[in-house]
């Protein structure tokens, strides 16, 4: 006890809170300086000036992590969080959901009769232009399971890089995903548009649905079961119906799969994981009560399956970001060599070999498009470089060996569209000493030529109204984004860039018109997350132009009207 009392009475050692710049550089203790009042011993011996500066925590202003370091950090962060969330959710909800849903594995007669009664099946893999609703039966749990709230998110995780400085984040606000996130934080009106909350229930104890409601979770699949059919979630007949609906409703938006190759038996034998993810995507729209169960059966890696995981996620699915899944797919692409360029097709190639080769090539092209699209949306650097295959992809749709598919035309067209977007964005980001009017004139001219070329190719392929509208939507989105870069560059001038202002306005309005056409075709709800992001970006950009009306009114009104009309 006496020793303990002596230790309590012993005065604590007080160390200097600061060190001079010389000692900091040497990473040694600064001795004898008395917290900046005198010259330290090291500076005395070296006969140099003893300078004290305040600590600057974090990275130096203007310094950035390399893009490779950022991507690796995001991948590791997303993988760790996905694992931890999966384990905690399984332990918390598996028992309660099993008790409340004893017959999830049994087929639903209402679903079978409802789907087979509608007369629309994909004719030869082609997309029917003006499609009526499917008139599927309603399920009582489907609506509540996917209610949106202020805590859920359907947009890209564009702000997961906490290490970026405030100035970096301000510059990144020009990119669509960050622009939408900023507007959501800025005004509750935008939060209501982009992610509405449920109205509170009546009664004294009413609280927001997002704070009290937790959607039921499915139990994990039993050991040894690899896909939804073997797990008893759906039978083979239901799986075939879901595949038909996927090719009719979902594949026209992503153009990733070939109905001649990707049959139920082929996909199930080749990749249980891909089969599971396709069934999962179909269940999201046509059997939503089975959606969560299918998500838990993913146990093997496949590039196409990762792409589908980024296209159609649940409203409450925050397991990881789209960027992480695309990163996984890009790294797998390097390992398995999907981008191998085959200039001359072997003469002894069988029909199955041709379909499989085209499938590998299509997968890589779609992955390349998705990678460049994310770069445009978020401002991050792309992961896949251009190679021989990409440089020779402008006529890829013609080398199918048979009739040209409209979906393949879209894939080849989008590769060229990403070239135009990346080239223009790079010029503005690097600050090249070129007139913005010249850059814009070149970009808009290329987009006009692209539109003429690929509309002609689509006509030759026999595309429908949906395919032409789909091409137009993405062209208008690129036109809006590239012209917004020039408009932002001229924001400090007394008179804005009228050419860019006119292009931004018309592109945003026309984009929303195309989205309205999708609604009239009854296909809008089947679009991937990118469609939601692009339509939100166009609407928010029009509202931002409205906020800046007073500043733009300083320019000549007649000149503005002439440009817009």
UniProtKB/Swiss-Prot annotation:
Residues 90-111 have a biased composition (Basic and acidic residues). PROSITE patterns: ZN2_CY6_FUNGAL_1, ZN2_CY6_FUNGAL_2. Keywords: DNA-binding, Metal-binding, Nucleus, Transcription, Transcription regulation, Zinc. One of its GO terms (cellular component) is nucleus. One of its GO terms (biological process) is DNA-templated transcription. InterPro entries: prtT (IPR051089), Transcription_factor_dom_fun (IPR007219), Zn2-C6_fun-type_DNA-bd_sf (IPR036864), Zn2Cys6_DnaBD (IPR001138). Residues 20-50 bind DNA. Residues 129-155 have a biased composition (Low complexity). Residues 82-170, 195-224 are annotated as: Disordered. The keyword Metal-binding applies. Its main location: nucleus. GO terms for molecular function: DNA-binding transcription factor activity, RNA polymerase II-specific; transcription cis-regulatory region binding; zinc ion binding. It is found in: Nucleus. Residues 203-215 have a biased composition (Polar residues). Gene3D superfamilies: Zn(2)-C6 fungal-type DNA-binding domain. PANTHER family: FINGER DOMAIN PROTEIN, PUTATIVE-RELATED, TRANSCRIPTION FACTOR DOMAIN-CONTAINING PROTEIN. This is Protein priB.
């Amino acid at each position: 006890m006496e020793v303990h009392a002596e230790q309590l009475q012993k005065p604590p050692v007080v160390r200097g809170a600061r060190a001079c710049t010389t000692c900091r550089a040497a990473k040694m203790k600064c001795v004898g300086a008395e917290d900046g009042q005198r010259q330290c011993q090291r500076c005395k011996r070296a006969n140099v000036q003893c300078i004290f500066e305040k600590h600057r925590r974090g990275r130096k202003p203007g310094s950035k992590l390399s893009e490779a370091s950022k991507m690796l950090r995001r991948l590791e962060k997303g993988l760790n969080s996905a694992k931890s969330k999966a384990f905690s959710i399984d332990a918390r909800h598996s028992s309660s959901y099993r008790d409340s849903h004893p017959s999830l594995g049994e087929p639903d007669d209402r679903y079978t009769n409802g789907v087979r009664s509608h007369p629309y099946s994909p004719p030869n893999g082609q997309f029917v232009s003006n499609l009526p609703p499917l008139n599927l039966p309603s399920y009582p749990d489907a609506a509540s399971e996917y209610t949106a709230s202020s805590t859920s998110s359907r947009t890209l995780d564009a702000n997961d890089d906490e290490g970026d400085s405030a100035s970096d984040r301000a510059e990144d606000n020009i990119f669509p995903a960050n622009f939408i996130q900023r507007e959501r934080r800025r005004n509750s009106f935008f939060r209501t548009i982009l992610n509405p909350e449920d109205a509170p229930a009546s009664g004294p104890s009413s609280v927001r649905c997002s704070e009290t409601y937790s959607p039921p979770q499915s139990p994990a699949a039993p050991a040894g079961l690899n896909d939804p059919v073997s797990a008893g979630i759906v039978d083979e007949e239901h799986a075939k119906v879901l595949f038909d609906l996927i090719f009719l409703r979902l594949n026209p938006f992503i153009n990733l799969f070939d109905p001649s190759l990707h049959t139920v038996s082929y996909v199930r034998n080749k990749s249980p994981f891909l089969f599971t993810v396709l069934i999962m995507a179909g269940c999201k729209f046509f059997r939503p009560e089975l959606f969560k169960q299918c998500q838990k059966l993913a146990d093997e890696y496949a590039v196409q399956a990762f792409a589908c995981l980024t296209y159609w996620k649940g409203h409450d699915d925050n397991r990881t970001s789209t960027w992480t899944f695309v990163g996984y797919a890009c790294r797998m692409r390097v390992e398995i060599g999907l981008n191998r360029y085959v200039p001359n097709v072997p003469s002894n190639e069988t029909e199955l070999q041709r379909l499989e080769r085209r499938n590998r090539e299509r997968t890589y092209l779609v992955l390349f498009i998705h990678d460049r699209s994310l770069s445009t949306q978020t401002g991050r650097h792309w992961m896949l470089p251009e190679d021989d295959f990409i440089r020779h992809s402008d006529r890829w749709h013609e080398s199918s060996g048979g009739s040209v598919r409209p979906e393949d035309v879209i894939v080849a067209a989008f590769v060229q569209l990403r070239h135009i977007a990346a080239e223009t964005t790079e010029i503005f980001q690097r600050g090249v000493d070129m007139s913005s009017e010249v850059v814009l004139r070149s970009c808009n001219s290329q987009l006009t030529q692209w539109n003429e070329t690929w509309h002609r190719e689509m006509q030759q392929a026999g595309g429908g109204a949906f395919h032409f509208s789909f091409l137009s939507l993405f062209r208008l989105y690129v036109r809006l984004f590239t012209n917004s870069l020039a408009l932002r560059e001229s924001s400090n001038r007394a008179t804005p860039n009228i050419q860019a202002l006119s292009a931004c306005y018309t592109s945003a309005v026309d984009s929303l018109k195309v989205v309205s056409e999708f609604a009239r075709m009854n296909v809008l709800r089947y679009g991937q997350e990118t469609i939601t992001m692009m339509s939100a970006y166009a609407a928010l950009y029009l509202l931002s132009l409205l906020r800046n009306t007073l500043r733009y009114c300083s320019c000549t009104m007649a000149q503005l009207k002439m440009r817009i009309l």
